[in-house]
Design a protein with these regions (language model features):
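RNase H catalytic domain
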Residues: 10-16, 65-154
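Intrinsically disordered, low-complexity regions of eukaryotic proteins
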Residues: 31, 62, 143, 162-163
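Short amphipathic alpha-helical face segments that pack within enzyme cores
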Residues: 58, 62-66
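Extended, charge-rich low-complexity interaction segments
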Residues: 155-163
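RNase H-like nuclease fold core
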Residues: 1-58, 70-73
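Charged, low-complexity, intrinsically disordered terminal regions
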Residues: 2-4, 144-147, 163
């Protein structure tokens, strides 16, 4: 069976240089039914890059990692293919190995996501990643935005579409 994972990250910046970070992940089954969705937040998270500049990239990486992790914990039987979609070109290209990770603080996030993907592949699951425009990522974006505003969402348990 084919499953699709949509992820997104968001930061609501504050005057003190910190931000409220939100992450969202949505998993669809092969019939495009939502089988899992979740929004997570990390309030007042300071995630400056190597140049001391605030970046949204950590939130994007965290969203991908948490989505992969949640799916692996609640993994449905018979998942043969996982298609991953996100609107962060940087995260998609770096995880695929097409772009170098220039910011040292992002390398650990990229490595964690790649390790998760390799676990799926080791079990015979075909994994692909694709960049999509923000307009096609609205459910994950909405979860991330709401989580950054302090409204975490925990939804239905992941289940096999045969249930």
């Amino acid at each position: 069976m084919i499953y699709k994972l949509y992820f997104d990250g968001s930061c609501k910046y504050k005057n003190d240089g910190s931000c409220d970070m939100g992450m969202g992940a949505v998993v669809l089954d092969s019939r495009n039914n939502i089988v899992y969705e979740q929004g997570w937040n990390t309030p007042a998270y300071d995630h400056k890059d190597d140049n001391g500049i605030l970046s949204n990239n950590v939130a994007e990486y965290q969203a991908l990692f948490r989505g992969l992790d949640a799916l692996s914990v609640k993994r449905p039987d018979g998942i043969s293919e996982l298609r991953i979609y996100g609107d962060s070109k940087l995260v998609i290209e770096q995880v695929q190995g097409n772009w170098k990770v220039k910011a040292a603080h992002l390398k650990k996030y990229r490595d964690s996501c790649v390790a998760q993907i390799k676990l799926y592949e080791k079990e015979g699951c075909k994994v692909s990643l694709e960049w999509i425009p923000r307009e096609q990522n609205k459910p994950a974006d909405r979860l991330a935005q709401n989580a950054a505003d302090g409204m975490e969402r925990h939804s239905n348990q992941l289940h096999d579409e045969r249930d």
